[in-house]
Regions:
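Beta-strand-dominated extracellular/periplasmic modules and repeats
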Residues: 2-236
Length: 236
């Protein structure tokens, strides 16, 4: 559906380089998308990472834990990720396309570029797509990812995390961030997460665990603009 002039969402005008990430092997160098406004709490940018899915992922494919519908499930702890995407006025954003990708329970990505010694799970797909409904909500099911060593760096284990990519009407670039899990000790020493100086902004990337009768459920809401705008990387 074409957008009207009033539907086009404003983009921030200031950018801050991310030189600290330039030295991280395997990560795409990006620039921060930083709002020019003063924000009370800012959810920080996160890098796209080296293992963006190389397969075609179909809209509606929200299950990361099985390669085929109804097929064998990947091993590990089942999880559900839910959330809402809103705009600058707090209005839900319908029709936004969300892509996610993550490692398996052993910390291995389903990607040919992952040459680590972590165990492969043949039933693990590890990526998916969803389109937000009229209320701006999305949902994924999968397996909680494991930690893994960052290639080329001694004693650096990346905490469990999920990569997010968001496309929405009126946004000229896809928006990239990462979701982390609460209660993970590696969160406290991860150079990427702790490269965010503002404590409140850093905490905004950690999902909130909710009660569920079917397993672990994590909430990760995304704000595209406004005073609580989520910050993202722009892929260069």
């Amino acid at each position: 559906m074409p957008t009207k002039p009033d539907d086009v969402l404003p983009h921030p005008t200031s950018f801050v380089s991310t030189e600290r990430l330039a030295q991280i092997k395997g990560y795409v160098l990006n620039e921060r998308r930083t709002p020019a406004r003063n924000l009370p709490v800012v959810t920080p940018h996160q890098t796209i990472g080296p293992f963006y899915p190389h397969h075609l992922v179909r809209p509606g494919d929200e299950d990361l834990a099985a390669c085929d519908v109804g097929g064998p499930r990947a091993e590990g702890e089942p999880m559900e990720i839910v959330g809402t995407i809103t705009d600058l006025s707090g209005k839900p954003v319908a029709g936004a396309l969300i892509e996610v990708w993550t490692a398996n329970a052993h910390g291995k990505y389903s990607h040919p570029a992952d040459h680590s010694s972590q165990l492969i799970d043949p039933n693990f797909k590890g990526y998916g797509r969803a389109i937000t409904g009229p209320s701006g909500t999305y949902r994924f099911v999968g397996i909680k990812p494991g930690a893994y060593p960052n290639p080329g760096y001694d004693n650096w284990m990346r905490p469990p995390h999920v990569h997010f990519s968001v496309y929405a009407a009126g946004v000229m670039h896809r928006l990239i961030t990462q979701m982390y899990f609460p209660g993970e000790s590696l969160n406290d020493i991860d150079p990427i997460l702790n490269g965010i100086d503002d404590l409140a902004a850093r905490a905004s990337l950690i999902a909130v665990e909710e009660k569920s009768d079917t397993g672990r459920r994590y909430r990760f809401d995304i704000v595209l603009q406004g005073e609580a705008e989520t910050q993202f990387f722009i892929e260069r």
